[in-house]
Regions:
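Cytosolic ligand/metal-binding cores
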Residues: 1
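C-terminal substrate-recognition "lid" of short-chain dehydrogenase/reductases
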Residues: 64-92, 97-98
């Protein structure tokens, strides 16, 4: 519950900051990543969790992102190409948020 509450707190902070500082030209956005292949999760993944996630990956076709894919979303948000984006939460999760 604490993890979920903290994530939603960051969403609110992103939007509030965008509202407050947007008039001064400050853009505030967030990226909501799904699983990323960093290797950090491997020691924490229990056999039970692996048994639940593995079949989901195969049936739904979801993938674990490479760090470069997540970085590309962040680079886009920092670029002039996203100059009209403010207060957004960009999912970079390969479809995990719709499952």
């Amino acid at each position: 519950a604490a993890y979920t509450a903290s994530k939603h707190g960051l969403l609110g902070l992103t939007r509030s900051t965008a509202f407050l500082y947007g008039p001064q030209g400050v853009r505030t956005n967030a990226v909501a990543p799904g699983p990323v292949a960093t290797g950090i999760e491997a020691p924490m993944l229990s056999p039970l969790a692996a048994g639940r996630v593995g079949p989901l990956l195969q049936v739904v076709g979801l993938q674990v992102a490479q760090p470069e894919q997540l970085a590309a979303a962040i680079v886009w948000l920092l670029s002039d190409e996203s100059s009209n984006v403010n207060g957004a939460v960009l999912p970079s999760d390969g479809g995990w948020s719709v499952v």
